[in-house]
Amino acid sequence: MFRIASTIPILWSFDITSGFRKACGQDVYLFSPYADDEKTHRYNPLDYISSSPAERLGDIDAIGQALYSGENNNDKFWSENAKDFFRGVTLFVLETPGLPHTLGEILRQASGKGKPVKEHLLGKLKEAQDAGHPYSNNCVDALNRVLSNSDNTLAGIIATFNTALLSFQNPKVDLATSASDFDLREVRRRRMSIYFKIEPTKLKDARVLINLFFDQLLNLNTRKLPS
């Protein structure tokens, strides 16, 4: 039986096919981030960021590339700076004790937590420096590159940055991406199926999440052949 990962617009198709796959010995998961009853398996894209400093930046940049492709040359300046900002804020979240490692938290921190974003982030960098546990050079450099822009330019960068992450301000999506109940790296090695359910009315809102899910699924399963 083939492993699958597929999007489904309506639940009855899951009900029909998932039972058959379970009977054939597969583990079956339903990722339904907009479910009204919040019954969903969870998928956290940040769980695939390595803890190794040598690999961490590349993993973050791979997510940033999926979020901010910048296919239009006219938008390249904004998308490249949005990726740089994503790199910096993601490192900030990962390196700050006690913060959830989620895309929702990245959006919250990049929104300033009630302060202008520059004041909030630079203030946190200074606090850590003064306390003797500074953020990594990669984090500080990425944030400084973006936050040193003029106010108008910074506003444009942040607007581009926010566009890709606004769906994660939805509490249901934030919860559904707060941890992982399945491992995309296991799709080629284990007998498993992942159904990604999105209601037709949410397809536009979920576009970024769908793209990121399948981008990670492809990249993580083509790094090496399954054993």
Identify what each model region corresponds to:
Residues 1-227:
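P-loop NTPase motor domains
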